[in-house]
Amino acid sequence: MRYVFLYIICLFLTINSALATPNVTVALVAPKAEEYIQQGEELNKGVKRAIDEINNEGGLLGKKIDFLAVDDQCNDSIAVSTAQMLAVQKEKQIVLVIGPYCANSFDQVADVYAHAKIFQIIPTAVNYTQAKTIKKGLVKMLGYTNQEAKDFFNYYNSTFAGNKVAVISNSNDAESMEEAQALINEFQKHGKSVVIKLYTYDITNKDYEALAELVQKDGNEMAFLLGTAKNIRKMARRLREYNEKFIIFTNKYAANNSYFDYLGSLADGTYFMELRGRNDDPELAETLVKLRLSGFEFEGLSLYGYSAVKLWENLVKKAKSFEYDKVSAHLNDKNIKTEFGNKMFHNGAPKVSESYAIYRYEDENYVKVY
C-alpha cells in the first residue's frame, strides 16, 4: 500500500505541473517501464505526432491540445487510482484518455472515466473481459483479440493442416489465458480440437527447457507463444535449441524487439502476427505517404496511437464540441471516418474487428504470408 500511495502522490504532482494553461488535455495511459516499455513508447510517439499536427494547424475548435503521458503499471489497484486521479483534475479539461494499455481492473477504470465524462479510446484490440464493458464514451477502436485466433486458424488450415499445435500461455496473466482460450475455441469450432493443446509455463515451474522437451515429445510440430516478452523469448529459444526446425508463431507486439537480441539467428523462421497489413491497405496509403514525406515513420503501435487521436478529432468536429455526451452521440453515426476507412460502431466497437497479417521473419526481413 505504501508503494501505491507514493505512486499516487508522484502522479498528482506530475499532472498538476502540466495544468498551467487553459487548453484541453489528451492523456495517454501506457507503460513507461518493464516488459511493455516498447509498446508504451510506440503509442506515445503516435499520440504525440497526432497532437502536434492538430496544434500546428491552429488547434481544435479554437483550442490547443496539451499532452499528458501517464505510466500504466499494469497493476489492479494502481490502474483504478490512476483513473481516479485523472478524473478529479478540474483546473484543465482532460477530454480524452487513450488507454490504458493493460486490462487491469478494466471495468472499474472505465466506470471512473464514464462518471467523470471523459471520453476513452482503447487503441489496441481488446480481450473478452474488456469486450463486456460498455460505456457510451468508451471506444474499442480495433475490435477484439479473438480475430487473431480466426486469422491464425485460417492460415494454419491452408498451410499446416494436420500439424499438432501447442498453445503456451502464462497462467498468471488473464489476458494471455483469454487469448489462449480463443485459439482453442477456434479450433474446436472447426472440429479440430484434437490437434491443439494448451500448456502453461508453470507446469514445469518455468523450466523452459523441460517444457520445450515436453511439448515436442507430445508430438507438437508448432507452437503459438503467449505471455510476457520474457516468457515468449525464453520459450522460443528453448524450443529452437531442442529442434531448429520447430515452427513458432507469436504476436509481434507481445514479443517486442528483445526477441531478436535474445534468439539471434534462432529467430529466423518465426511467424509474427500483427494487426492488419500496412503495405496493401488503400485507406491508409495517403496518410502514410504524407507522414513519410514529412520524415515520420510508424513503428509498431505508433500507428494506433496516432489513429486514436485522429478518430477523436473527427468525432469532436462532428459534435462541434468537446463535451462527452455530444461527442459520444456521434459514435452511433452510420459512417465514422477513421485512418482505416469509414467504420460503423456498435457498443463502442467496430462491427468488423481489424484483421491480422502474418509475417515470416528471415535474415532481418519480414515476408508477408497472410
Provide a role label for each language-model segment.
Residues 4-10, 19-370:
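Extracytosolic ligand-binding ectodomains
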